[in-house]
Design a protein with these regions (language model features):
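Accessory interaction regions appended to the cores of large information-processing enzymes
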Residues: 1-195
Length: 195
């Protein structure tokens, strides 16, 4: 069903309801916003939960920045008077279903976090990319460098690192100059020619 405005749509709703005896519902259209960031930011998050037996523990330190195609590998970041040198171990580029990319860079040195927990951290990041920290819209074009963290020999598990990664990402995203991207559509207008 289409119309030239709200009046036309209400008239159609009335006609369908009265003539065809069908119930028609109107819903507000959901605008497909996207979220992204404009500058680099750093965050760390410790997920710690203790309840009787084995608890949960995972700590993630990360830096996020805007991503663009052809961007060089990160070497160092400076925040205030602190400089962070990056030793890139591995890079994963993920093409997002909703457009854009997430680049996940492993810069962990010295076994601060076992490699077996990196997929869990990535899942936590994807949780937040699918439901952005600002409006709940999809986030896009972000590079995340995980450079440090802590684990516990007994209490660390995948869920702990998934939650730590997700919450560290949210915190960093909010400090990275977040912005909302509005959709742009191609529109073709056809009009009859006057002869």
């Amino acid at each position: 069903v289409s119309g030239q405005g709200e009046f036309h749509l209400r008239t159609l709703k009335w006609r369908i309801g009265n003539n065809e005896k069908l119930m028609v519902e109107f819903q507000e259209p959901r605008i497909p916003y996207r979220e992204t960031i404009t500058k680099a930011a750093r965050a760390d998050y410790r997920h710690k939960k203790q309840s009787g037996g084995a608890g949960q523990f995972g700590e993630v330190h990360l830096i996020i920045e805007p991503y663009y195609e052809g961007m060089p590998a990160p070497e160092s970041y400076k925040f205030g008077n602190q400089e962070f040198k990056m030793n890139v171990r591995d890079t994963q580029t993920i093409d997002l279903d909703w457009g854009g990319k997430l680049v996940f860079v492993n810069c962990i040195v010295g076994g601060a976090i076992d490699a077996r927990f990196l997929p869990a951290i990535l899942k936590g990041l994807m949780d937040r990319m699918e439901q952005g920290p600002l409006t709940g819209s999809y986030a896009r074009d972000v590079r995340v460098c995980v450079y440090d963290g802590k684990m516990h020999p007994v209490d660390s598990n995948e869920i702990s690192f998934r939650l730590a990664g997700r919450n560290a990402f949210s915190e960093a995203f909010k400090n990275a100059g977040p912005k909302i991207l509005e959709p742009v559509y191609d529109v073709e207008v056809l009009v009859p020619s006057d002869k």
